A protein has these predicted regions:
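C-terminal edge-of-domain segments
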Residues: 110-197
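Short, structured beta-strand-loop surface elements
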Residues: 60-118
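A generic local secondary-structure boundary/capping motif
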Residues: 16, 93, 143-146
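Short, basic/aromatic recognition patches
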Residues: 2-26
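A generic structural signal for short beta-strands and their flanking turns/coil linkers
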Residues: 23, 38, 49-53, 69-73, ...
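Short beta-strand segments
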Residues: 21-59
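Short, solvent-exposed cationic patches
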Residues: 1-7, 50-79, 133
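Residue-level recognition of well-ordered beta-strand positions that form the cores
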Residues: 41, 56, 76, 107, ...
Length: 197
């Protein structure tokens, strides 16, 4: 991903936090030279000394069959984004778009059933733990658990991580503050999240 230096984030701890907060991502691979993508909730996990992006695809989704032939796949995590009007600047200029995004590159591997079950347990814990009647794997019926046969687990070893936080850091202090103030005035929740970033 092209990232001007002032928008680059290199701290992996910041990236991990962002991925945890924006975990619905896009996995991109190629099949016969054509890009294909799937949108899925993913986890970032440390397994032994390496970091992986983990998740699952429907067994009927043909993308998982491309992973063996792809030396690398791309995973895109998109955060909040918002239009920035040039009317918010103290001088004439062009409008822009502010956003946060992370690109992960790595080799995708299929999980065995035990690894997949462990990943599903963690996924349920992440999204259910704060709920009043939370669902946990151990309490699911064997009939429900058998639905695991309909999905394929995937783990992507992180070889490279790129993060872009384009948040008007290149503007002077007056314009920067004006942008934040105007973003808070927008009705779009994304604009508020960009202002808070």
């Amino acid at each position: 991903m092209f990232i001007p230096k002032q928008f680059q984030i290199t701290d992996f701890e910041i990236m991990k936090e962002f991925i945890n907060e924006n975990s619905f991502a896009t996995i991109v691979s190629t099949e016969h030279g054509r890009p294909i993508a799937t949108h899925v909730p993913l986890l970032i996990r440390q397994i032994e000394r390496e970091y992986y992006i983990t998740g699952h695809l429907a067994y009927t989704n043909p993308q998982w069959k491309t992973f063996e032939d792809n030396k690398q796949v791309l995973v895109i995590f998109q955060g909040p984004h918002a239009y920035v009007s040039s009317s918010w600047y103290s001088h004439e200029n062009v409008p822009t778009w502010n956003y946060q995004s992370i690109h992960i590159y790595g080799k995708a591997q299929l999980m065995n059933e035990q690894e997949l079950e462990e990943d599903l347990i963690l996924l349920l814990q992440k999204y259910e733990r704060h709920r009043k009647n939370s669902i946990i794997w151990e309490k699911l019926s064997s009939k429900t658990k058998r639905q695991i046969k309909g999905i394929i687990g995937v783990k992507i070893k992180i070889n490279e991580a790129q993060a872009a936080y384009k948040l008007s850091q290149n503007r002077n202090e007056e314009d920067y503050q004006s942008i934040i103030d105007h973003l808070y005035e927008e009705t779009d929740i994304n604009a508020h999240q960009v202002a808070e970033a």
